[in-house]
Swiss-Prot record:
Family: Belongs to the GrpE family.
Region (Disordered): 1-39
SUPFAM superfamilies noted in UniProt: Coiled-coil domain of nucleotide exchange factor GrpE (SSF58014), Head domain of nucleotide exchange factor GrpE (SSF51064)
Compartmental location: Cytoplasm
Organism: Brachyspira hyodysenteriae (strain ATCC 49526 / WA1)
Protein name: Protein GrpE
Gene Ontology terms for molecular function: adenyl-nucleotide exchange factor activity; protein homodimerization activity; protein-folding chaperone binding; unfolded protein binding
Comp. bias intervals (Acidic residues): 1-23
Any single biological process term in GO: protein folding
Subunit structure: Homodimer.
Transmembrane segments: none
GO CC annotation: cytoplasm
Amino acid sequence: MEEEIKETSEDKEEENTEAEAVENNEKSEENAGNVEEDEITALKKRIEELENESADMKNKYMYAMAEAENIRKRTAKEKADSIKRANKGLLLSLLTFMDNFERALKAGEQDSNVQGSEYYKGIELIHKQFIDFMHDNGVSEIESLGEEFDPNVHEALTMIEVPDIDKEKVVEVYAKGYKLNDELLRTAKVVVGKPAAAKE
């Protein structure tokens, strides 16, 4: 009987041990499930953080690229404007030489000894080349003589009364005006004729 009790108590111990093992195994699986859920939650959170970080970096990259493009465009525009200003300054300076050629030609027209000479023909040729050069670079003369006075392109040096006109018109040009493409390069210096005052 003693043996039976021993066997029974050993069986019970074995059953208890097995039950504990099963219980521990269940708890272990439960804990493992909780650990897996915690790991999954942590990984999802980390993925979300990395996605946000990636989106932020992408936005910063796009902003930097747009800023670089704006700087490139602004620099190109500033360079073009600088070249345009330099060209305008040079062409404006050359107009003085053009004026002097025209004065020389006008003086030669009044002197019959000079008019047919090789010297005069040379000045005419150089003047023509000068005009061609200016035209090739976008410079064009502003037609003024006989035109209605326009303060945007004409500078009135003096005004005189002229019969038989109803509006102010340019009656004499002292210095021609010029445009560079569509932009005013130099105003024409002119004498303006105004309608004669009515006599009482």
